Amino acid sequence: MSKKIDKKEQIGKSSINTKEAKHKADSQAGQIQNPIFEKNLQALFQQDEILAARLFAMGAQDKYEVFIGKDPLDINIIDRKSFKYIYENPIKDTHDMLESLEKQYKRYPIMYFYGLGNGILYKALLCNETHQRIVVVEPELEIIYIVLNLIDLSNELASERLTLFYSEFANYSQFYYLIAKVEFNRYAKLYDLHIHTDFYDNFADDYQRINQEFTKAISQMVASSGNSIDDMLIGIKNHIENLPTMITGYSYVDLVKKRHNLMDTAIIVATGPSLDKQLNTLKKFAPYATVISLDASYPILLKHGIKPDYVTSIERVVATSSFFKHKNKEFDKDIYFIVASLTHKQTIKNILPRRLVLTIRPQPSEFIFDLKKYGYLGIGHSTANQAYQLARVLGHKNIVLIGQDLAFAPDGKSHATGHAFAQAEEHLYTKAYGGEGEVRTTYVWDKFKNQFEKDIEESKKEDIATYNCTEGGARIEGAIEKPFLEVMNKLCKDKKVKNLPNINEVKEKTANRYLLQSYKVISEKIKIQELAKSKIEEVFLKVVPQIDNILKLRDEGKVTEKLFDKLVKISNQIDKVKEFIIKENYQKFLDSIVSISIYYQELELAKISVAPSDTAIEKVNKLIEWVEIHKYWLFSVAGGLNADIETTKKASRNLIKELKKRGLIEKSNLGKSKDNFRF
C-alpha cells in the first residue's frame, strides 16, 4: 500500500468487506471452496483440532475489513468500529519488522509472537532455516480466519515450524506441553514474547495473561527438569537400594489390573488447613468411595478412625518416614501404601510389614530397568499429584480434592491440625478459591498447583470430572468448585459399601527374573558410563591447557583473527565427544546424569549460539566464549558420571546380597565402590 489509509473515508471505497474477501472460503454442503483455506485448515487440524473445527464452522464475519492493494503483500486489516488498523503501511512495516528481527534474532531457533497480523511476516521469517519454530498467539479468531483464507501457510503449519494459538483457547497446559519439548527446552532463556504491531496494544490485558502463562510454563518445565544433581543421585541411590524390596513385594500393575474401574469416585485427602472442617463428611462417605490419603494425612486419618484405601508417598527424604511410625494392625489391614521406589529406606522400614507397593516413576534413570510391572507413577514433585494420577489410572470418573489448600489459612496456618510440619515463610500470591481475591502461597505449592492443572486438563479428555471441595485456599484452574457435602451426596447416592479385592506378592520365579534383569542393566550402565567418562577426561586434558592460554590472551587484550582456526579445532574435538554421548545405544544410560550436570551451562550455550557474529573478530570472540563454557561443561559431565558410577556401585549391594542369597549369582562383576565417596 503506497499511502496511509484515511480510515473513515476509505471504508466502502478501496476496501473489501470481510465477507467478500472470504467468499472463496464459504462452505456449501460441507465443502470448502477456497483451496488456500482448505490446505491451511487441513494442516492446522494436525496441531489444533478444536481451532480448526471452529474456523471450519465460521460463517460471514463483519468485525474487520480487509484492504488489498495491487501488490499481493499489500494486505491490511481494519477494525470497522474503532477504525484501528494493524499496519500504517503493510509492505514497509513488514519489511522493517523483518529487517529488525533478522538483525537481532536471525540465529534464534525459537521465537514467540503475540499477533498474527496478515501472516506475511511469519512466512518471510520461516525462509530462514535457523528459525526452527515460530509460535504465534492471536487474540482475534476473525483475523486468523482472514489470514488463512489469503496466505498459504499450509507447509509451515503442517511441519509445525509455525505453531498457531487462538488466545481464547490458549492456556498454561498447552504452553507447558509445547515448552517441554526437547527443541524448546534448551532455549528457555531466550523466551521473549514479541508484539506484532502497535495495533495489538489494544489487547494489553490478554497479552499480559499469555505472557504470564508462558512464563509459568517455562518455570514449571525448568523445575520438572530438576536443578540438583544431589537430588538426582539420592533418587538413584534409593531406587537401586530398594530394588529387592520392590521386585519381591506387591506389583503396582497387578493392583491396578485387579481394581481398575471398580469405583466411580475417589477422594484425595491432603493436609491443608481446610481439612479440619471436612473430616466429619469424609468419615460419613469413606465407605462408599475410594479414599486416597497423602502420606502427611495418614496420621490425621488414623487419629479420627477414617480408613483410606491407599496412602501415597513420593519424597526421598528421611523426614517423610515419621508419618508411618504409628501402626495399628486392624486399621492398616488391606491399606496399600503406594510409595515411589526412590523413597528413603527408613520409610520402607516404618511401613513394613504392611502392604507396601513400591512404584517406578516415569523418569529416564528408572525407565532403563524396563520393570513395567512396577510402574509408572508419579509425574511432578508432590505426592498430591501422585495421588491424582493414581486415581486416574484406577479408572475413577470423579476425583474429589479436599484439604488441597496450596495456600496459607487466614490465621497463617499452612496445614491441618495434627500435621507434623509447618511451611516456611514466603510471600507469593495466587487467585483464591472461588475466584475472589488472592491468597498467600509458596513457590513449591505453586508448582504443585501447576501440575494439578496440567493433569486436570488431560483428564477432561477422558471425561473425568475433578471437584475441588477444599472450600478454601488457592483456586486450581479446571477443577469444579463445590461444597464437599453437596458433591458427596450427589456422587454417592444409592452407592453400596465398597468391597475391594486384594492381590498377592509377586511369585518367586517372576521376582528372580526381574532381580537378574536389574543386575544386568546396572552392569551395562556402569560399563558405558566408565567408557564415556574416560573419553571425556581424555578430551578435557587435551583442550583445557589450550583454552586457558587463549583466555589469558583475551585477558591481556591480545585476541586476533589468527586464533580462529585453533578455536575451530578445539570446538571440533569437543563435538566428537558430544557425538559419542548421544549415540542411541549409549544415550539411555548417559542422558539423565549428563543433562542435569550441565543443564544451566546448556542454557548459557544456547544464548551464545544465537549471538550475532558478522565480522571475523566477532566470530573469534564468540568461539572463545563457546569453548570457555565447554571447559566447565566437560568437567561437570565427567564429575557427574563419576558420581553416578560410584553411587550405583554402592547402592547395588542390597541387590547383590539378594541375588547371592537366592543362588542366582556367585559373585559380582560390578567392581568395588569407593566407601568414602560422597556426593
What is each model feature region?
Residues 25-58, 63-72, 103-108, 112, ...:
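The AdoMet/dcAdoMet-binding core of the Class I SAM-like
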Residues 297-298, 305-315, 391-418:
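Glycine-rich phosphate/pyrophosphate-binding loops
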Residues 461-679:
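Long, compositionally biased charged/polar accessory segments in the mid-to-C-terminal portions
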